[in-house]
Amino acid sequence: MNDILAKILAVKAEEVATARQMRSEAELLREAQARQDVRGFAQAIEDKIAQGKAGVIAEIKKASPSKGVLRENFDPAAIAATYAVHGAACLSVLTDVQFFQGSHDNLRRARAACPLPVLRKDFVIDPYQVISARAMGADCVLLIVAALAPSQLRELETLAMELGMDVLVEVHDAKELDIALSLKTPLLGINNRNLRTFETSLQNTLNLLPQIPAGKRVITESGILSPEDVKLMRSHQVHAFLVGEAFMRAEDPGVELARLMG
């Protein structure tokens, strides 16, 4: 792992160590367990799809390592509100500071501004981050197979579910998919962007579809830029999408969501 992902994970390990010194895991766990406000993330996606619509996880991110700043005029609450009005099923909020210019506060503000369930989008490598996700109000956490050993994936999934959250497991290739299929979560994200090179191809989702059993909800991630991309995926029975960049670059992200999903 000699690449962008490795660099990010090294920073995450430092961040977790620092956070633990500021606040004990036991104290954070008490706060997370005291929250009784989980919104059903997987259910929100299924509800949209049952209505014949796309289940869109609409992302809130200011910047990315590959593209730099995506949105100068960045107001997480306003973006969340327009996403909700224009039919998003859920939100994804970047909480990574160094690489995506995100924050915990962005997640809190976005969630407070609308009724949608929220994914904490970050590079989770430690139970502390899962507990922190629930404490800040997240309804779902992202686990990236490329970043974690199978035993870690199982441990973190179990913890997230014990705290009432859903889990989105993300894969990029057939080897990672095999590992992900051993987890309990029905939410299977296929990232069309290679996290090692940051290149994107929608073919990635289509190539992996034949290997995915019934009972898993496929969410195609990255590279969905046009209504044609959406139609292509839906013609292959992929009805859930995680979209960020296309919305962030638009004048009104919610209006762009409605346009993209037709």
UniProtKB/Swiss-Prot annotation:
This is Indole-3-glycerol phosphate synthase. It catalyses: 1-(2-carboxyphenylamino)-1-deoxy-D-ribulose 5-phosphate + H(+) = (1S,2R)-1-C-(indol-3-yl)glycerol 3-phosphate + CO2 + H2O. Keywords: Amino-acid biosynthesis, Aromatic amino acid biosynthesis, Decarboxylase, Lyase, Tryptophan biosynthesis. Its EC number is 4.1.1.48. InterPro entries: Aldolase_TIM, Indole-3-glycerol_P_synth, Indole-3-glycerol_P_synth_dom, Indole-3-GlycerolPSynthase_CS, RibuloseP-bd_barrel. GO terms for molecular function: indole-3-glycerol-phosphate synthase activity; phosphoribosylanthranilate isomerase activity. GO terms for biological process: L-tryptophan biosynthetic process. It comes from the Bacteria. Belongs to the TrpC family. Pathway: Amino-acid biosynthesis; L-tryptophan biosynthesis; L-tryptophan from chorismate: step 4/5.
